[in-house]
Amino acid sequence: MKKTIIYTAFWLATAGIALTSCEDIFGGFLDKQPSNELTEEEVFSQWTTTREFHFDTYNFLRHGACRINNSWMDAATDLAETSYASGGTRTSFNIGNYYASGAATELTGTWEHYYRGIRKCNMLLKNIDDVPKATDDSEEAHATYVKQYKAEAHFLRAYFYWEMFLRYGPVPLVTDVLDPDGDLLSNYTTRPSLKEYVVDFILKELKDCEEGLMDKATSAESGNPGRISQPMARALYSRVMLYMASDRFRSESGISWQQAADAAQSFMTDYGTLYGLYTTDTDPKTCYTNAILKNAHDEKNNETIFWRNDVAVGWGAIYNDTPVGEGGNGGLCPSQNLVDMYDMANGQSPFSSYDETGAPVYNGTATPAINNASGYKSNDPYSNRDPRLAATVLYNGVNWGNGIINVLKGQRDNPQGNANATPTGYYTRKYIPEVILNNNHTGSNYRNWIIIRYAEILLNYAEALNEAGGSRADV
């Protein structure tokens, strides 16, 4: 019988789970190489290698924006364009040829990526009950670890299948460890129904695993940053329930808006005291910026529920997303469509008419009709806007980094002959830690990729309750 080979890097044990951008330390388990080879039996013969194997599964939580050649996929929408010209990236976006680039693995490799993560979860669940305890652990501690690891594997598997669903719809639900030399197709010739896939599997996995996970306090300890905890399972459950209650899926899922509202409310009831909106500053723009960038543990960001833990990064991690006047490659450039979607600070819409996408209607004119009651001024379009606009978009005249953004033709951020200069008049501010630009770009900062924030739970509740016909006061 052919033995499955698994590769391990033993330095991971000393690294804890402060995960780096390493995609997959163990992912080549079907390849054969001369060093660091362990069979499946050897990996699960001791707790140390089992622990390493399990923690590596966290590497399948994707971090960063989905990209083609260093440019975010938002550029494929009407909300942004890419300024990144290298390797034909801009051309790929403009003509929709997203697969031409060899760097489009986050599109072409998604299927393989998540099934590899799922396989690792299945392998752990198959073997962990037979792994001997570590010498220094008591029987009670070992039993706790086994319970936690199994619960985390169930969560991660459910999350990976949910990500697959968002891209492909229901895909084959593989819960066993398939033999690469065996029959891989006979049991997976038909798609599961939406109810079988989401309601009977994903939602059940999330509900069943919650009790075995760490509580938030244990997850927040220094050795466990980023570990899956009970609130994460409940939060993902709320997200999935909201999708399933929508008009798109409700007839197949059987889930109502009220059930989705109840799911969000259960999080607020059981875990709401542990989380809150990140309001550590009197400036709303700063609060929003920090809610996105601040680390959940070291920087006490209690709005973050579920995120991909990462390490502090420097200039090399952001220069492809930074304005050319700062020495970067421009990257994702927000469009006027996106800017126009932001309301005024008083909550009113700046324009009088919008289409179904949320963009203002131009009706053949150079500018959309202004809602005069909103206070919007066409000669000062960025003043008194929703503060999230200034936290998301770098526009002309704003002070940022080591200078003032100037996108006028031939100026600092739109110089003649620079192929990466913004084509829209805007650059991205969100997700870019400005502190990295200090001292000649020698600063560093965490760039954690948030998957679920507490703000989403509040919005899930409000949206579902509103659709269910809840009272205005409750909404």
Protein language model annotation of sequence segments:
Residues C22-M73, S383:
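Membrane-proximal, proline-rich intrinsically disordered regions
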Residues E42-T48, R90-Y99, A103-H113, G276-Y454, ...:
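Elongated scaffold/linker segments in the mid-to-C-terminal portions of large proteins
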Residues Q46-G64, G87-Y168, N187-D200, K204-S222, ...:
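Conserved, well-structured interaction surfaces
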Residues A134-K147, F249-I255, A468-D474:
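Structural helix-adjacent loops and short alpha-helical linkers that scaffold large soluble proteins
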Residues M164, P170, D179, K195-E196, ...:
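Aromatic-lined, polymer-binding surfaces characteristic
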